[in-house]
Regions:
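Aliphatic-rich helix starts adjacent to a transmembrane/signal segment
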Residues: 2-54
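Flexible, low-complexity segments enriched in proline/glycine/serine and punctuated by aromatic residues
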Residues: 41-44, 51-178
Length: 178
C-alpha cells in the first residue's frame, strides 16, 4: 500500500480558514450589537427629551395668561452649569400669579433636563421670522450639542438651521409649543 505524503497539513489549513471566517462573522455580529446599543441610547434620550418638552408645553397651555412670559423664563435656565435653584414662590401649594407659575414651570423643566444631562431653551420656531404672531418652539439638546442664550435670544444653530432642518450629527429635538 502506497501512502501519498504530499497531502499533509491540508486539513489544518481548512480548519484555519474556517476559523478565520468564523472570527469575521463574530466581529460583524459584535459591531451590530454595538450599533444597536447606540441606537437604543439615542432612542432613550429622544424619549426623555420629548417627555420634558411635552410636559412644559402642557403647562403652557394650562397657563394661557402667561404665554408671553414662558420664552424668557425658559431661556433664563438655558446656560445653567449646576442644578437650578428653586424660584420663590415654589407654586406647589401657594397661590401664584401666571408669571410666577411660568417661571416655576420653566424651573421644573430645566431641573428635569439637567438631571439627565440635557439643556433646554425656547426660541421662535424656524421659518416664522416675519409672521405677525411668532410660534414658539422648545428645544432640548444633549451630548455634544449645545444651546445658548445671549441677551434675549436663544442660539439653537448647533441643533437646527433657520429653515427647520436638523444639523447633521446633532443630538437635539424641537417641539412647537404654541
Amino acid at each position: 500500500m502506497k501512502i501519498n505524503h504530499y497531502q499533509k497539513g491540508v486539513g489544518l489549513i481548512e480548519v484555519l480558514v474556517a476559523l478565520l471566517l468564523l472570527a469575521v462573522g463574530v466581529l460583524g455580529y459584535s459591531i451590530l450589537q454595538i450599533r444597536a446599543v447606540d441606537a437604543s441610547s439615542e432612542a432613550l434620550s429622544r424619549s426623555q427629551g420629548m417627555l420634558i418638552t411635552r410636559a412644559l408645553a402642557e403647562n403652557m397651555r394650562a397657563n394661557p395668561g402667561a404665554q408671553t412670559n414662558y420664552p424668557a423664563a425658559v431661556r433664563g435656565f438655558t446656560n445653567i452649569t449646576a442644578a437650578p435653584t428653586v424660584p420663590s414662590p415654589t407654586c406647589y401649594n401657594s397661590v401664584c400669579t401666571p408669571a410666577q407659575m411660568a417661571n416655576f414651570d420653566a424651573y421644573m423643566a430645566a431641573r428635569s433636563a439637567f438631571a439627565i444631562g440635557m439643556n433646554i431653551t425656547m426660541a421662535d420656531c424656524p421659518g416664522v421670522g416675519s409672521a405677525p404672531i411668532k410660534r414658539q418652539c422648545i428645544f432640548v439638546a444633549w451630548g455634544n450639542t449645545t444651546l445658548s442664550v445671549s441677551g434675549t435670544t436663544a442660539d439653537v444653530s448647533n441643533c437646527m438651521n433657520t429653515s427647520g432642518v436638523y444639523v447633521n450629527g446633532s443630538n437635539c429635538l424641537m417641539m412647537e409649543a404654541y
